[in-house]
Amino acid sequence: SLEGVGVEGSDKVTELALNNNVITCHNYATDGPLKFSKTFDLAWSTEFVEHVEEQYLDNFVATFKCAKYLAITYAYIKQYGHHHVNENTEDYWLEQITSRGFTYDEETTRELRQKTIEDWKDPRSPVDQSKVEGWEAPYHFATRGLFFKNDLLL
């Protein structure tokens, strides 16, 4: 069976979510680290890490450490967006995550990025790409996705 949990920083978003029974509302800046008592196969974090100040990195990495594998995307410098307080480079995120007990899996990252692009180009895609002006590879993972292995759990 498939089981998952979500972590959201906004009370309002948590309340409005259709699946709020599996979402934990948690602010990594004010609530500290969040650790789950169970281990998950995968932690998936899309366009989140740039929303937390660098001083609180350990707080959300504690959540990531509850999974055997980690896939993240990040906002690049000057991407701009609501509460983007830590836009940074790929090298920065590689250093931050690997220095906290994960191993970067370059081969899997490359494969997942390629698969993301293939899915985007697939005419059966649920998103009508013709209506998205100027997007050559719109899915975040295609250009800013990173995949890691958790050395502590593998």
Regions from the PLM with identified roles:
Residues D31-P33, E111-T116:
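A short acidic, often aromatic-flanked loop/helix-cap motif at beta-alpha or helix-coil junctions
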Residues E118-L154:
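Core SAM-dependent methyltransferase catalytic element
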Residues T98-S99, S125:
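Disordered, low-complexity tails and leader-like regions
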Residues S1-H83, E87-L94, T98, F148-N150:
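Conserved SAM-binding loop
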Residues E87, R110, D119-K121:
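General N-terminal targeting signals
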Residues G9, F102-Q114, Q129:
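Conserved S-adenosyl-L-methionine
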